[in-house]
Amino acid sequence: MTPISITLLLLLFVIILFITEKLPLAVTSMIALITLVLTGVLSPKDAFAGFVDNNLILFVAMFIIGGAFFETGMANKTGGIVTKFAHSERELIVAVMTVTGLMSGFLSNTGTAAVLIPVVIGIAAKSGFARSRLLLPLIFAAAMGGNLSLIGAPGNLLGKSALQAIGADIGFFEYGYVGLPILVVGIAFFATVGYKFLPNKKPGSEGESVYDEAQDFSSVPAWKQKASLIIMVLTIIAMIFEKQIGIKFYLSGCIGAIILVATGVISEKQAYKSIDLQTLFVYGGTLALAKALEKTGAGAYIADSVIGLLGSNASPFMLLAVVLLLSCVMTNFMSNFATAALLIPISLNISAAMGADPKAVIVATVIGSSLAFATPIGMPANMMVFAPGGYTFNDYVKAGLPMVIVGYIVSLILLPILFPFYH
């Protein structure tokens, strides 16, 4: 069997298992990596290169920095302060989505949701508001906020890695040029028209969950909470001014993480616990698959096939619409990170074949992969509110599908202006 055939079969295998999740995503990714080595498609050095990638090092550092923000209770306090100013259900939706979106722009989407879910449940219980109308906007905002910065979501860094491999790059806030408008429009949507699509389940009819009991952070010293916030802010500032200060962004992350552990703001055990190993293995494994797609020509073959279906005279707008639609559809039936991991190398090949700006195609792919609102399986946070909100699958479709369409339209308008496919 030829290397290109092996790579295409492995890609199909990964897609099927990513969708069905018959095996954990990390296991599927590693099966693909090991198979590429055993069949000789990739050398061990090329296959495992993703595990010493700069962005994977940044993942580890930011997991620890985010973990300190969560473990000290600073994230909980931040959410509680903001939501105190909301006096009606719609005002609370705006407050919850705003704080969630901003936090998830720099922290783990799942971690942000996990911290704010009990805060929102507590407020709903005290005020008599239906938690079912608050929890879906919360997780949707977590996904939207992930596009505010380079470190907001794992897929963003996958895009950066892919661009760096071809000598290009993307700035710290460039995803936010499209991500912020989507978040603002999303908040406005659920405060107005979208409010009607949110399920209104009577208090008490929602499911029980582990989030019903809020964590007690009263024993955590105030200096630890302040330190976690200050170090996180300073780390982000250092990343933004990477070129000016001469320290690579991943090293700034490492310095911040080391300071937090060394000063005892977060214990070594808590630091290890905060690292999401699945993300690291999926990242490393899918980078190997991306390398195989490039090396064997399988990626170029897929790109040529897509272009063949579009026609040789396809307009840039048509190409954008197709790339964005493919990302949107796939991300609602498999992990948003897995969608980005699979589509980014293919998108790069499409851009090369059509002579389009690779950054434009990558940004479209990453943004589309974040619009995982229409099903409970698009991202982990979606499933986290399933029981406490008392939701059904159709609740996600009814509230989330309109938001997917809104996000798609906003992207179609902004991407050609901010990231044109052709200059």
Positions of PLM-derived features:
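Alpha-helix N-cap/start motif
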Residues: 44, 90, 131, 172, ...
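Hydrophobic alpha-helical transmembrane segments
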Residues: 1, 173-186, 317-329
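Transmembrane alpha-helix interface/packing and boundary motifs in multi-pass membrane proteins
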Residues: 14-23, 99-109, 140-151, 238-244, ...
